[in-house]
């Protein structure tokens, strides 16, 4: 597959800038819509035949970037066929309130390279490269923490586990604390936390709990590039949801997926851009010297992880680019 990393970077940067202009205004829906529109417009300039496999929802519930939507400059004659997963603004409430951790995210692969996950919850445990292979989704929390600590050559009391602050995690939170590990509760943004768990120096050693299945697939795409690991299982709410999963080709709803199974693509591209400051990426900064963004772009076909600082000049002739 043609290297789309710089094109994908441009998409998440434009979405981040658009949503950052709404930051702190208290309107999560407007922030998300700004990111969606910017992302859609930018993707339609890329010479590719793209299909949204994870997006804003079903066609009848999302005006743009719905599952099955075609994107790309179709009149370019391109034969680059790609599946695309997007979270135009992960942490819409974070952006609306000006809180830390909002990012824009896109992953792409050859056709069939990303699991078509239903919009439901997914149990997850996420660790970095050092603890890869040491955890078990069905194991007791304390056992997993012992295994992670052993791999990281530290005590359990030196571990930091990120958990979404939800009522459903009450028992999980108790078990983590009872084992002696520390917890960082977050209101939103488990995708960003999952990436941070696989990057040394972020202060995050694991992510546990249930969150969105689409975010789980996006996290898996990032972890394929970072050599991290996610183990996940879909959470079935009722018979109607089970039937919907089976219609999407998921026969065994109790199956535990690993990183490779969630994102099996041979040519994965993953990009994220900070909207507000977070553990991994700085947020968008509007200055007299242009607009500054910080992004991460990763690929598997030519393994590389790039942290990119960009100054967007906005066609202003008097803007000065400074050495940083």
Give names to the regions the model predicted:
Residues 44-45, 70-79, 87, 95-99, ...:
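Solvent-exposed alpha-helices and their adjacent loops that cap or buttress functional pockets
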Residues 105, 110-186, 248-251, 278-285, ...:
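Acidic beta-strand-loop-alpha-helix segment within the catalytic core
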Residues 189-190, 199-227:
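Glycine-rich phosphate-binding loop
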Residues 59-61, 168, 187-194:
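Short acidic loop-to-helix transition motifs that present clustered carboxylates
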Residues 88-97, 102-104, 170, 191-195, ...:
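Short glycine/serine/threonine-rich phosphate/pyrophosphate-binding segments
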Residues 7, 11-18, 22-24, 29-30, ...:
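Anaerobic metallocofactor- and corrinoid-dependent redox/one-carbon enzyme cores
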Residues 32-111:
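Flexible, acidic active-site loops/lids enriched in D/E/S/T/G that coordinate Mg2+ and/or position polar
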């Amino acid at each position: 597959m043609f290297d789309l990393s710089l094109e994908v970077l441009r998409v998440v940067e434009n979405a981040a800038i658009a949503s950052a202009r709404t930051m702190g205004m208290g309107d999560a829906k407007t922030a998300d819509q700004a990111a969606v529109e910017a992302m859609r417009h930018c993707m339609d300039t890329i010479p590719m035949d793209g299909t949204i496999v994870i997006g804003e929802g079903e066609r009848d519930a999302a005006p743009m970037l719905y599952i099955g939507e075609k994107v790309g400059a179709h009149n370019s004659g391109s034969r680059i066929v790609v599946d695309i997963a997007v979270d135009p603004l992960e942490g819409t409430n974070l952006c609306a309130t000006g809180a830390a951790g909002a990012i824009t995210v896109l992953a792409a692969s050859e056709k069939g390279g990303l699991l078509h996950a239903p919009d439901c919850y997914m149990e997850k445990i996420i660790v970095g490269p050092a603890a890869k292979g040491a955890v078990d989704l069905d194991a007791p929390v304390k056992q997993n923490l012992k295994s992670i600590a052993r791999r990281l050559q530290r005590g359990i009391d030196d571990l930091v586990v990120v958990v979404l602050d939800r009522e459903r995690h009450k028992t999980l939170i108790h078990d983590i604390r009872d084992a002696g590990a520390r917890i960082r509760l977050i209101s939103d943004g488990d995708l960003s936390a999952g990436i941070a768990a696989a990057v040394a120096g972020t202060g995050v050693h694991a992510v546990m709990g249930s969150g969105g299945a689409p975010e789980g697939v996006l996290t898996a795409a990032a972890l394929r590039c970072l050599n991290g690991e996610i183990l996940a299982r879909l959470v079935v709410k009722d018979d109607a949801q089970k039937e919907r999963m089976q219609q999407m080709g998921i026969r065994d709803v109790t199956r535990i997926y690993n990183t490779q199974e969630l994102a099996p693509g041979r040519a994965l591209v993953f990009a994220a851009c900070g909207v507000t400051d977070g553990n991994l990426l700085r947020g968008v900064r509007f200055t007299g010297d242009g607009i500054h963004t910080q992004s991460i772009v990763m690929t598997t076909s030519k393994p590389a992880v790039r942290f990119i600082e960009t100054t967007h000049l906005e066609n202003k002739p008097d803007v000065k680019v400074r050495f940083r």
